[in-house]
UniProtKB/Swiss-Prot annotation:
One of its GO terms (molecular function) is exodeoxyribonuclease VII activity. Its EC number is 3.1.11.6. It is found in: Cytoplasm. Residues 65-95 are annotated as: Disordered. It holds the Pfam family Exonuc_VII_S. This is Exodeoxyribonuclease 7 small subunit. GO terms for biological process: DNA catabolic process. GO terms for cellular component: cytosol; exodeoxyribonuclease VII complex. Belongs to the XseB family. Heterooligomer composed of large and small subunits. Bidirectionally degrades single-stranded DNA into large acid-insoluble oligonucleotides, which are then degraded further into small acid-soluble oligonucleotides. It catalyses: Exonucleolytic cleavage in either 5'- to 3'- or 3'- to 5'-direction to yield nucleoside 5'-phosphates.
Amino acid sequence: MPASSKSRTSAVPTIEELIQRLEEITRNIENPDTGLENSIALYEEGMSLAEECRKRLLETRKKLETINPAETARPAKPENAPESPRMNDLFGTES
């Protein structure tokens, strides 16, 4: 049976699935009915997922730099966009 993107047999989640889970975790932590212990467990899971997302984004960036180094030499930033130190931290770049 051929594997399709909709019927993946791999246990490795896509980055979109990781982000979806992070959003779910955020909603649960923000819910006042979520207990402290559960919030801590959710926070730990979220930090782990965020690190996995960061690693995958860095891998993707490296692939893009290999494909077209001239286009990825400097991060694209819209004109008059505010500085985002969090994005710089995420990718390990400077503005």
